[in-house]
């Protein structure tokens, strides 16, 4: 099924109904990535761009022609909004601590696949930017509605990001992303 701009807008409205805090940012949905980023942003020059989150503008942007179907779009919504917007709901010191925890986890067997995917897609990024992408890719796997254990998320955050008493494992990343998603759902 080809995704239309109108259908994508309906999916954003559904997403914001599930995650009310997501309605505090704006959404820019266009047919092509050139319409979003300019004529120089062709697939040949920039690669395929599904979407992005611009924290300074508080806006998620999506190029509809690059999506296979609505599930692909929903997954990218979770990536951009739960991941990139969600990580920015931490204060700067907490966000840095989360990113450092994710960076330190790169050799964990459960985290290696996420790190490899990010390294393949974004080889030019700094470790900190790659860590944010790892976080965002983990958010793609969140299934709505969120009913995570906030206490477990807080424990994982404290132990792996603040106190650093142990290395982050994939279960901790799941706890953290679920805690963020639940925060966007419950506020």
Predicted regions, residues:
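Zn2+-dependent metallopeptidase catalytic core
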Residues: 2-26
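Flexible, glycine/threonine-enriched loop-and-boundary segments that flank and lead into catalytic domains
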Residues: 29-52
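Short pre-active-site segment immediately N-terminal to the catalytic Zn-binding motif
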Residues: 57-78
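Acidic glycine-/aspartate-rich tracts in secreted/extracellular proteins
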Residues: 68, 91-92, 142-144
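Post-HEXXH active-site segment of zinc metalloproteases
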Residues: 71-75, 86-123
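Pan-zinc metallopeptidase signature
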Residues: 116-187
């Amino acid at each position: 099924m080809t995704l239309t701009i109108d259908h994508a807008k309906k999916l954003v409205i559904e997403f914001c109904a599930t995650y009310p805090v997501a309605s505090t940012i704006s959404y820019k949905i266009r047919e092509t990535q050139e319409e979003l980023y300019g004529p120089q942003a062709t697939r040949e020059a920039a690669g395929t761009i599904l979407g992005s989150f611009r924290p300074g503008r508080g806006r998620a942007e999506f190029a509809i022609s690059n999506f296979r179907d609505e599930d692909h779009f929903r997954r990218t919504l979770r990536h951009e909004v739960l991941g990139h917007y969600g990580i920015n709901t931490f204060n700067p010191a907490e966000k840095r601590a989360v990113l450092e925890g994710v960076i330190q986890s790169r050799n964990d067997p459960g985290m290696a696949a996420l790190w490899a995917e990010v390294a393949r897609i974004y080889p030019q990024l700094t470790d900190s930017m790659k860590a944010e992408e790892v976080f965002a890719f983990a958010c793609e796997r969140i299934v709505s509605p969120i009913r995570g254990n906030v206490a477990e998320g807080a424990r994982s955050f404290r132990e792996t990001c603040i106190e650093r008493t142990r290395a982050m494992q994939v279960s901790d990343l799941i706890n953290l992303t679920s805690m963020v998603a639940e925060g966007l759902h419950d506020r």
